[in-house]
Amino acid sequence: MLKTLGRSVYLTQFEEQRASLSAFAAGGAPVFISLHISEEFDAAYCARVQEMCDFLSAQGWRILADVSEKTIRQFGCADLTALAKRLHLWGLRLDYGFSLEEMCALAQQLPVAVNASTTTPEVARQLAAGGGTVIAMHNFYPRPETGLDPEFLRESTAALQAEGLQVYGFIPGDALLRGPLYKGLPTLEAHRTAAPSAAFADLALNYGLDGIFAGDPEVSAREQEYIRHFCTTGELCLPVVLRPGYETLYDRTFTCRPDSPKGLVRYQESRLYSCFGSTVQPDNCAERRRRCVTMDNIGYGRYSGEIQLVRTDLPADEKVNVIGEVPAEYDLLLDCIKRGKTFRMVKTS
């Protein structure tokens, strides 16, 4: 189970991020920074980076920095180890310009992250055999349509994990996006318009990633709370808009029945929780589209009061009431609710 959501901090937006980074109890949570974004370079660059890293370290963040050979020269350090010490870096993300031998040697001194999309299983095997701490990290993709496909992410992640590497990736933010495109910074293209908590759960449960960062500068407090709840309890928060009269179903823990079919989530406790019992009258017996929450009415006899979440479009049924709907940005969560696992419906603000 993942313990927390990592953050990304950008020098040009650091002052905008400072307040939330101060308010959040880091406790060793990871934060990603890049030290080779050319548009950030100016005469005060090194001093500004130093101040940012001093702050992050003092707040308890573990800093993972994206670096290049040029970074060493910019800061006037003898080598990457000296740079890491100066900037309080927990780990270094290395991309182009470093040999396998250099990466293995550096990994003996501090955690090293390599590019998960370009590192072959053979190279991963050699890195893992070196005995140091090596992580494979997927990129984020600012331009729409350039994010990874599901098949590639799943296959590359599994191949690297099979060789002994942990694999990290990125999800988009929702409160403050990164320019100049402001289109989200996900690893997976399908996550670009998704809610952060839904993308987080998808990477964790359906792709098996070992670490997840928000690529954009800010994630809303609400989404952070959904992620925190999942990380600490294993229970998914499912935002739902329920029709009037059904609000008592909010904030109750439900279990996906172990025998649920692929197209439906059957709520194991629904008839136990239901205050409607056999009195559920037909109401809003509409088409049951994916993301609809339904309740069987009296037409289904003893099934009256049973709740289901629709994962595959179904026709209208006079014996089934549509009582709510999951917002589109949380669609990914429907395929994260596994048989036998718990979740709770929460009210959207």
Predicted regions mapped to residue ranges:
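Electropositive, surface-exposed helix/loop patches at the edges of structured domains
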Residues: 65-81, 99-104, 152-155, 205-214, ...
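C-terminal functional modules
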Residues: 244-349
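Short secondary-structure transition/capping segments
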Residues: 6-9, 76-87, 105-119, 160-164, ...
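Short, Lys/Arg-enriched, disordered terminal segments
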Residues: 1-3, 348-349
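Active-site beta->alpha loop and helix N-cap motifs at the rims of alpha/beta catalytic domains
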Residues: 2-133, 140
